[in-house]
Amino acid sequence: MLNLIKKEIALCMHPTAFIFLFFAVLVFVPNYPYEIIFFFSCLSVFFSCMMTRENGDIAFSCALPVKKEHIPFAKMLVVFGLQCIILLLVGVIGAIKGAVLPAEQYVNQAGISANLVLVGNGAILLGIFNLIFFPCYFKNPDKIGVPFVIGAVVIFLLISVFIALRWATSLYSTTLNGLNSENTGAKLVALVIGIAVYVVLSAVTCKLSMKNFQRVDL
């Protein structure tokens, strides 16, 4: 499994998978829908799967002395790792922003502020994208566009919901917005819920994707 993961990183990861990690600094952009940052992580998955297809990596991997179900599992583990890194970076850089900027400049007028709740929201977005994209992709690894478009549409709809909640509910506009030092307990609960959703959805994603890939005739 470790060798498969190394192979994924060396041969299948598109450069954008690493470049887009630096987009976490977008939390310093004032009045910006920060959930968009996580869409770029989804976009890097699309580019990496395209690279996998163009390099004929699936057929190559199936010729290796490994279990067939380990092939999708290794790819997803690499993606999950990169997603956890972007979540961590957004949380850390958001905390730095809160420490160096005045409170009135920290509050985001275009959505939730760069706090723990944003990380929880991002975890939910990434988990849902994984659940939509990977099981469909591993049914037919040559067909990448449709699963990605469906996943992207759902992601942007959810981002719109998060933005609407920022203005429609006092929970999002007051309690969950602003600095982490304000209403910390509520923000931690939102973070834990988001991470829990991500873990559950990722586990389901792995199970469905591995099952679907077993049926692929290469």
Locations of the language-model features?
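Juxtamembrane/interface alpha-helical elements of multi-pass membrane proteins
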Residues: 60-62
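Alpha-helix N-cap/helix-start motif at helix boundaries, enriched for small hydrophobics
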Residues: 70-72
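Hydrophobic alpha-helical transmembrane segments of membrane proteins
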Residues: 1-58, 74-218
